[in-house]
Amino acid sequence: MSWPTFWYQTPKQSWKTALLWPVGKLVCWVAARRLKRFKKKGPSKITAAQVVVIGNIVVGGSGKTPFIQWLGRQLSEHGLTFGVVSRGYGGQSKVWPQWVTEHSEPTMVGDEPVLLAQSLHCPVAVSPNRADAIALLESKYDLDVIISDDGLQHYKMARDIEIVMMDSERLLGNEYCLPAGPLRESKRRLGLVDFVVWNGGDASDLASETSTIMKLVPQHFRSVANPKMILPISSFKHEKTNAMAGIGNPQRFFNTLSELGIDADVTPFADHKAFQSSDFDTFESTKPLLMTEKDAVKCRAFAQPNWWYLEVQPLCPATFAHQLFHKLGHYDFTI
Protein backbone atom coordinates (compact mmCIF):
# COMPACT_ATOMS: atom_id res chain seq x y z
CA MET A 1 0.00 0.00 0.00
CA SER A 2 1.22 3.48 -0.82
CA TRP A 3 0.77 5.88 2.08
CA PRO A 4 -0.16 9.55 1.50
CA THR A 5 2.97 11.63 0.94
CA PHE A 6 1.64 14.47 3.09
CA TRP A 7 1.89 12.20 6.13
CA TYR A 8 5.64 12.58 5.82
CA GLN A 9 5.73 16.32 5.17
CA THR A 10 5.59 19.21 7.62
CA PRO A 11 2.10 20.68 8.16
CA LYS A 12 3.18 23.83 6.32
CA GLN A 13 3.96 21.74 3.22
CA SER A 14 0.46 20.32 2.82
CA TRP A 15 -3.02 21.85 3.02
CA LYS A 16 -4.41 18.33 3.47
CA THR A 17 -2.87 18.10 6.93
CA ALA A 18 -4.57 21.33 8.01
CA LEU A 19 -7.88 20.17 6.53
CA LEU A 20 -7.81 16.78 8.28
CA TRP A 21 -6.23 17.94 11.54
CA PRO A 22 -9.55 18.21 13.47
CA VAL A 23 -10.44 14.62 12.57
CA GLY A 24 -6.96 13.51 13.63
CA LYS A 25 -7.41 15.21 16.99
CA LEU A 26 -10.67 13.32 17.47
CA VAL A 27 -8.98 10.01 16.62
CA CYS A 28 -6.24 10.74 19.17
CA TRP A 29 -8.84 11.64 21.80
CA VAL A 30 -10.84 8.46 21.22
CA ALA A 31 -7.65 6.35 21.35
CA ALA A 32 -6.64 7.99 24.63
CA ARG A 33 -10.09 7.36 26.12
CA ARG A 34 -9.96 3.69 25.12
CA LEU A 35 -6.52 3.32 26.69
CA LYS A 36 -7.65 5.05 29.89
CA ARG A 37 -10.65 2.71 30.13
CA PHE A 38 -8.37 -0.30 29.58
CA LYS A 39 -5.90 0.85 32.26
CA LYS A 40 -8.74 1.45 34.72
CA LYS A 41 -10.72 -1.72 34.12
CA GLY A 42 -9.32 -3.95 31.42
CA PRO A 43 -10.29 -7.58 30.77
CA SER A 44 -9.18 -10.28 33.17
CA LYS A 45 -6.20 -12.34 32.09
CA ILE A 46 -7.30 -15.78 30.88
CA THR A 47 -3.88 -17.43 30.82
CA ALA A 48 -1.03 -18.09 33.22
CA ALA A 49 1.43 -17.52 30.38
CA GLN A 50 3.15 -14.16 30.02
CA VAL A 51 1.44 -12.26 27.17
CA VAL A 52 3.82 -10.08 25.15
CA VAL A 53 2.24 -7.71 22.64
CA ILE A 54 4.36 -6.64 19.65
CA GLY A 55 2.58 -3.66 18.09
CA ASN A 56 3.00 -0.18 16.71
CA ILE A 57 1.45 3.27 16.81
CA VAL A 58 2.27 4.07 13.17
CA VAL A 59 0.38 2.44 10.29
CA GLY A 60 2.45 0.44 7.83
CA GLY A 61 5.31 -2.00 8.19
CA SER A 62 7.66 -1.55 11.12
CA GLY A 63 9.42 -4.91 11.45
CA LYS A 64 7.05 -6.79 13.78
CA THR A 65 7.45 -10.13 11.99
CA PRO A 66 11.28 -10.32 12.09
CA PHE A 67 11.27 -9.15 15.70
CA ILE A 68 8.82 -11.92 16.63
CA GLN A 69 11.15 -14.36 14.86
CA TRP A 70 14.06 -13.06 16.95
CA LEU A 71 12.07 -13.23 20.19
CA GLY A 72 10.76 -16.71 19.48
CA ARG A 73 14.26 -18.04 18.86
CA GLN A 74 15.52 -16.41 22.06
CA LEU A 75 12.74 -18.05 24.04
CA SER A 76 13.49 -21.46 22.49
CA GLU A 77 17.21 -21.15 23.14
CA HIS A 78 16.49 -20.56 26.82
CA GLY A 79 14.08 -23.45 27.21
CA LEU A 80 10.83 -21.49 27.29
CA THR A 81 7.74 -22.70 25.46
CA PHE A 82 5.74 -20.16 23.47
CA GLY A 83 2.96 -19.69 20.97
CA VAL A 84 1.82 -16.86 18.71
CA VAL A 85 -1.61 -15.28 18.29
CA SER A 86 -2.59 -12.97 15.47
CA ARG A 87 -5.64 -11.35 13.96
CA GLY A 88 -4.94 -13.13 10.68
CA TYR A 89 -5.05 -9.89 8.72
CA GLY A 90 -6.09 -10.46 5.11
CA GLY A 91 -7.39 -13.96 5.85
CA GLN A 92 -10.73 -14.75 4.23
CA SER A 93 -11.76 -17.60 6.52
CA LYS A 94 -15.25 -17.47 8.02
CA VAL A 95 -14.30 -19.70 10.95
CA TRP A 96 -12.48 -18.20 13.94
CA PRO A 97 -10.45 -18.94 15.96
CA GLN A 98 -8.36 -21.48 14.09
CA TRP A 99 -4.94 -23.07 14.03
CA VAL A 100 -2.25 -22.07 11.58
CA THR A 101 0.36 -24.55 10.37
CA GLU A 102 3.21 -24.24 7.92
CA HIS A 103 0.88 -25.72 5.29
CA SER A 104 -2.02 -23.31 5.90
CA GLU A 105 -3.26 -21.16 3.02
CA PRO A 106 -2.22 -17.50 3.49
CA THR A 107 -5.38 -16.30 1.74
CA MET A 108 -7.44 -17.95 4.50
CA VAL A 109 -5.47 -17.11 7.66
CA GLY A 110 -3.11 -14.29 6.65
CA ASP A 111 0.45 -14.28 5.34
CA GLU A 112 2.33 -13.36 8.52
CA PRO A 113 0.87 -16.16 10.70
CA VAL A 114 1.84 -18.73 8.05
CA LEU A 115 5.37 -17.30 7.85
CA LEU A 116 5.72 -17.44 11.65
CA ALA A 117 4.45 -21.03 11.75
CA GLN A 118 6.99 -22.00 9.07
CA SER A 119 9.97 -20.18 10.55
CA LEU A 120 9.42 -20.74 14.29
CA HIS A 121 7.74 -24.20 14.27
CA CYS A 122 5.56 -23.12 17.18
CA PRO A 123 1.79 -23.26 17.75
CA VAL A 124 0.02 -20.34 16.04
CA ALA A 125 -3.65 -19.41 16.43
CA VAL A 126 -5.57 -16.62 14.70
CA SER A 127 -8.79 -14.75 15.34
CA PRO A 128 -10.02 -11.16 15.01
CA ASN A 129 -10.59 -11.50 18.77
CA ARG A 130 -7.12 -12.38 20.02
CA ALA A 131 -8.49 -13.49 23.40
CA ASP A 132 -10.25 -16.32 21.53
CA ALA A 133 -6.96 -17.23 19.85
CA ILE A 134 -5.26 -17.33 23.27
CA ALA A 135 -8.01 -19.61 24.58
CA LEU A 136 -7.44 -21.94 21.63
CA LEU A 137 -3.71 -22.12 22.40
CA GLU A 138 -4.48 -22.77 26.07
CA SER A 139 -6.83 -25.63 25.17
CA LYS A 140 -3.91 -27.69 23.87
CA TYR A 141 -0.62 -26.27 25.17
CA ASP A 142 0.89 -25.31 28.51
CA LEU A 143 2.98 -22.31 27.44
CA ASP A 144 5.39 -20.01 29.24
CA VAL A 145 4.91 -17.07 26.85
CA ILE A 146 2.26 -16.04 24.31
CA ILE A 147 3.36 -13.51 21.69
CA SER A 148 0.70 -11.33 20.11
CA ASP A 149 1.50 -10.29 16.54
CA ASP A 150 0.15 -6.72 16.58
CA GLY A 151 -2.75 -5.94 18.92
CA LEU A 152 -1.38 -2.99 20.89
CA GLN A 153 -4.76 -1.28 20.51
CA HIS A 154 -6.74 -4.54 20.92
CA TYR A 155 -7.93 -3.93 24.47
CA LYS A 156 -10.09 -7.06 24.65
CA MET A 157 -6.78 -8.83 25.29
CA ALA A 158 -5.01 -8.53 28.64
CA ARG A 159 -1.23 -8.34 28.45
CA ASP A 160 1.89 -8.32 30.62
CA ILE A 161 4.42 -6.60 28.36
CA GLU A 162 3.96 -4.12 25.52
CA ILE A 163 6.66 -3.64 22.89
CA VAL A 164 6.27 -1.03 20.14
CA MET A 165 8.12 -1.37 16.84
CA MET A 166 9.27 1.81 15.07
CA ASP A 167 10.67 2.35 11.58
CA SER A 168 13.89 4.36 11.93
CA GLU A 169 13.48 5.77 8.41
CA ARG A 170 9.90 7.01 8.56
CA LEU A 171 9.81 7.73 12.31
CA LEU A 172 6.48 9.34 13.33
CA GLY A 173 5.87 11.16 10.06
CA ASN A 174 4.17 14.51 10.67
CA GLU A 175 3.18 13.27 14.16
CA TYR A 176 -0.57 13.63 13.52
CA CYS A 177 -3.20 10.93 14.02
CA LEU A 178 -5.18 9.37 11.19
CA PRO A 179 -6.28 10.61 8.70
CA ALA A 180 -4.13 13.76 9.04
CA GLY A 181 -1.02 11.67 9.68
CA PRO A 182 0.18 8.07 10.12
CA LEU A 183 -0.38 7.69 13.88
CA ARG A 184 -2.95 5.30 15.34
CA GLU A 185 -2.70 7.17 18.62
CA SER A 186 -0.68 9.98 20.17
CA LYS A 187 3.10 9.72 20.31
CA ARG A 188 2.74 9.96 24.10
CA ARG A 189 1.83 6.27 23.99
CA LEU A 190 5.52 5.48 23.46
CA GLY A 191 6.19 6.60 27.03
CA LEU A 192 3.66 4.13 28.42
CA VAL A 193 4.94 0.88 26.89
CA ASP A 194 7.66 -1.36 28.28
CA PHE A 195 10.05 -1.21 25.32
CA VAL A 196 10.46 0.54 21.98
CA VAL A 197 12.39 -1.35 19.28
CA TRP A 198 13.71 0.62 16.31
CA ASN A 199 13.98 -1.25 13.02
CA GLY A 200 17.39 -0.10 11.78
CA GLY A 201 19.03 3.21 12.55
CA ASP A 202 21.92 4.47 14.64
CA ALA A 203 22.05 3.17 18.19
CA SER A 204 23.68 6.38 19.42
CA ASP A 205 20.64 8.36 18.24
CA LEU A 206 17.78 6.00 19.09
CA ALA A 207 18.79 3.58 21.85
CA SER A 208 17.95 4.35 25.48
CA GLU A 209 17.15 2.53 28.71
CA THR A 210 13.79 1.34 27.37
CA SER A 211 14.54 1.27 23.63
CA THR A 212 16.88 -0.66 21.39
CA ILE A 213 17.86 -1.23 17.76
CA MET A 214 17.02 -4.29 15.67
CA LYS A 215 19.29 -4.98 12.72
CA LEU A 216 18.23 -7.16 9.78
CA VAL A 217 21.35 -8.88 8.49
CA PRO A 218 21.08 -10.45 4.99
CA GLN A 219 22.13 -14.11 5.05
CA HIS A 220 21.50 -15.69 1.64
CA PHE A 221 18.86 -16.23 -1.03
CA ARG A 222 16.49 -19.20 -0.95
CA SER A 223 14.49 -20.60 -3.82
CA VAL A 224 10.80 -19.70 -3.51
CA ALA A 225 9.79 -22.97 -5.19
CA ASN A 226 12.23 -25.11 -3.19
CA PRO A 227 13.45 -23.39 0.02
CA LYS A 228 16.12 -26.07 0.51
CA MET A 229 18.04 -24.50 -2.39
CA ILE A 230 20.31 -21.69 -1.19
CA LEU A 231 22.48 -19.17 -3.07
CA PRO A 232 25.20 -16.97 -1.54
CA ILE A 233 24.33 -13.35 -0.87
CA SER A 234 26.68 -12.24 -3.66
CA SER A 235 24.98 -14.35 -6.35
CA PHE A 236 23.15 -11.55 -8.17
CA LYS A 237 25.80 -8.82 -7.99
CA HIS A 238 26.63 -8.87 -11.68
CA GLU A 239 23.21 -9.76 -13.01
CA LYS A 240 20.21 -7.70 -14.06
CA THR A 241 17.23 -8.73 -11.93
CA ASN A 242 13.62 -7.94 -11.12
CA ALA A 243 12.52 -7.30 -7.55
CA MET A 244 9.09 -7.00 -5.96
CA ALA A 245 7.79 -6.40 -2.45
CA GLY A 246 4.28 -6.41 -1.02
CA ILE A 247 5.16 -5.21 2.48
CA GLY A 248 4.47 -2.10 4.54
CA ASN A 249 7.67 -0.35 3.48
CA PRO A 250 8.85 -1.92 0.19
CA GLN A 251 11.52 0.71 -0.30
CA ARG A 252 13.44 -0.67 2.68
CA PHE A 253 13.79 -4.02 0.86
CA PHE A 254 14.78 -2.33 -2.39
CA ASN A 255 17.40 -0.28 -0.53
CA THR A 256 18.82 -3.48 0.96
CA LEU A 257 19.23 -5.00 -2.51
CA SER A 258 20.98 -1.83 -3.67
CA GLU A 259 23.34 -1.97 -0.68
CA LEU A 260 24.17 -5.55 -1.69
CA GLY A 261 25.21 -4.26 -5.12
CA ILE A 262 22.21 -5.75 -6.92
CA ASP A 263 20.86 -3.90 -9.96
CA ALA A 264 17.12 -4.55 -9.90
CA ASP A 265 14.05 -3.22 -11.67
CA VAL A 266 11.73 -2.80 -8.69
CA THR A 267 7.96 -3.14 -8.40
CA PRO A 268 6.10 -2.37 -5.14
CA PHE A 269 2.78 -4.06 -4.37
CA ALA A 270 0.20 -3.39 -1.67
CA ASP A 271 0.93 -4.81 1.77
CA HIS A 272 -0.83 -8.16 2.39
CA LYS A 273 -1.69 -8.49 -1.30
CA ALA A 274 -3.05 -11.92 -2.20
CA PHE A 275 -0.82 -12.70 -5.17
CA GLN A 276 -1.94 -14.60 -8.26
CA SER A 277 0.30 -15.92 -11.01
CA SER A 278 -1.12 -13.29 -13.38
CA ASP A 279 0.39 -10.54 -11.20
CA PHE A 280 3.79 -11.59 -12.53
CA ASP A 281 3.03 -11.70 -16.25
CA THR A 282 4.77 -8.37 -16.83
CA PHE A 283 8.09 -9.53 -15.34
CA GLU A 284 10.76 -10.68 -17.78
CA SER A 285 10.86 -14.44 -17.30
CA THR A 286 14.55 -14.66 -18.18
CA LYS A 287 15.54 -12.42 -15.25
CA PRO A 288 15.71 -13.66 -11.67
CA LEU A 289 12.88 -12.30 -9.50
CA LEU A 290 13.87 -11.33 -5.96
CA MET A 291 11.41 -10.86 -3.10
CA THR A 292 11.02 -10.90 0.69
CA GLU A 293 10.36 -14.01 2.75
CA LYS A 294 6.88 -12.70 3.55
CA ASP A 295 6.08 -12.43 -0.16
CA ALA A 296 7.51 -15.88 -0.87
CA VAL A 297 4.95 -17.49 1.45
CA LYS A 298 2.17 -16.27 -0.86
CA CYS A 299 3.93 -17.14 -4.14
CA ARG A 300 5.19 -20.68 -3.49
CA ALA A 301 2.27 -22.42 -5.24
CA PHE A 302 3.13 -20.89 -8.63
CA ALA A 303 6.79 -19.94 -8.17
CA GLN A 304 9.22 -20.24 -11.07
CA PRO A 305 12.70 -21.80 -10.74
CA ASN A 306 14.43 -18.40 -10.90
CA TRP A 307 12.41 -16.78 -8.12
CA TRP A 308 14.38 -16.19 -4.92
CA TYR A 309 13.71 -14.61 -1.54
CA LEU A 310 16.22 -12.85 0.68
CA GLU A 311 16.56 -14.46 4.09
CA VAL A 312 17.60 -12.05 6.83
CA GLN A 313 18.65 -12.62 10.41
CA PRO A 314 17.11 -10.20 12.93
CA LEU A 315 19.55 -9.22 15.68
CA CYS A 316 19.00 -7.28 18.91
CA PRO A 317 21.64 -6.46 21.55
CA ALA A 318 22.20 -9.04 24.28
CA THR A 319 21.68 -6.32 26.89
CA PHE A 320 18.14 -5.80 25.59
CA ALA A 321 17.46 -9.54 25.69
CA HIS A 322 18.62 -9.52 29.31
CA GLN A 323 16.22 -6.66 30.15
CA LEU A 324 13.32 -8.37 28.42
CA PHE A 325 13.86 -11.74 30.10
CA HIS A 326 14.17 -9.97 33.45
CA LYS A 327 10.82 -8.32 32.76
CA LEU A 328 9.39 -11.76 31.96
CA GLY A 329 10.53 -12.93 35.38
CA HIS A 330 13.39 -15.12 34.16
CA TYR A 331 16.24 -13.64 36.16
CA ASP A 332 18.69 -16.45 35.36
CA PHE A 333 19.07 -15.27 31.74
CA THR A 334 22.74 -15.21 30.80
CA ILE A 335 24.28 -13.11 28.02
Swiss-Prot record:
GO terms for biological process: lipid A biosynthetic process; lipopolysaccharide core region biosynthetic process. Pfam families: LpxK. Keywords: ATP-binding, Kinase, Lipid A biosynthesis, Lipid biosynthesis, Lipid metabolism, Nucleotide-binding, Transferase. One of its GO terms (molecular function) is ATP binding. It comes from the Bacteria. Disulfide bonds: none annotated. ATP binds at residues 58-65. Its EC number is 2.7.1.130. GO terms for cellular component: plasma membrane. InterPro entries: LpxK, P-loop_NTPase. It is an enzyme of class 2 (transferase). Pathway: Glycolipid biosynthesis; lipid IV(A) biosynthesis; lipid IV(A) from (3R)-3-hydroxytetradecanoyl-[acyl-carrier-protein] and UDP-N-acetyl-alpha-D-glucosamine: step 6/6. It catalyses: a lipid A disaccharide + ATP = a lipid IVA + ADP + H(+). Belongs to the LpxK family. Transfers the gamma-phosphate of ATP to the 4'-position of a tetraacyldisaccharide 1-phosphate intermediate (termed DS-1-P) to form tetraacyldisaccharide 1,4'-bis-phosphate (lipid IVA). NCBIfam families: lpxK. This is Tetraacyldisaccharide 4'-kinase. It comes from Hydrogenovibrio crunogenus (strain DSM 25203 / XCL-2) (Thiomicrospira crunogena).
